[in-house]
Regions:
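Low-complexity, charged, repeat-rich alpha-helical/coil interaction segments
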Residues: 1-6, 64-70, 78, 99-100, ...
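Serine residues within intrinsically disordered or low-complexity segments
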Residues: 117-118
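Conserved small/polar residues in nucleotide/adenosyl-binding loops
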Residues: 108-113
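Basic/polar, acidic-poor N-terminal "presequence/leader" segments
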Residues: 1-38
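Short, compact, well-ordered microdomains
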Residues: 79-107
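Short, contiguous, well-structured surface segments enriched in hydrophobic/aromatic residues
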Residues: 23-79, 85
Length: 119
C-alpha cells in the first residue's frame, strides 16, 4: 500500500527503518478527537455506520459547505451538536473520500449519474 520514501538509520544504534509516505503520527490528536466526536454524534443521531448504507453524496457536499460557511461567518461551534463546524466539514470530506476510494460514487447517489458534474 505505502511505498517506502526513505530509509532512517538510528544514530545511536544503527538500526534501520523504512519510512513511508503515510505518517498518521503527524495528524493533530485534538483535531482527530473532534473528528471522532462528530462520528460519535452522528452514530448517536443516525445509528452506527449509518452513512455506509448510502445516500446521495451531494448531501455530504451540502453539509460540508454549510459547516464551512458557518465557520467563515465566525461561528466556531455547531448549535445542535456543540462540536466544531470544521470537524463536521472534515467528517463530510472523509465520507466523500471513503465513497471515492470504494468506487461508491455511483452507488451512493440518488440516480445512476455521477453528481459531481452538477456541483
Amino acid at each position: 500500500m505505502d511505498e517506502p520514501t526513505s530509509m532512517y538509520t538510528d544514530p545511536d544504534t544503527g538500526a534501520r527503518k523504512e519510512l513511508k509516505l503515510c505518517r498518521l503520527s503527524l495528524i493533530d490528536p485534538a483535531a482527530l478527537h473532534d473528528l471522532g466526536s462528530v462520528a460519535g454524534y452522528g452514530a448517536t443521531k443516525y445509528g452506527d455506520n449509518n452513512w455506509t448504507g448510502g445516500y446521495p453524496w451531494s448531501h455530504s457536499v451540502d453539509a460540508l459547505y454549510r459547516h464551512l460557511l458557518s465557520w467563515q461567518q465566525g461561528r466556531n461551534l455547531d448549535d445542535e451538536s456543540g462540536l466544531p463546524h470544521l470537524a463536521h466539514a472534515a467528517w463530510h470530506c472523509l465520507a466523500l473520500l471513503a465513497y471515492q476510494q470504494h468506487d461508491a460514487c455511483l452507488l451512493y447517489t440518488s440516480d445512476a449519474a455521477d453528481e459531481r458534474s452538477s456541483v
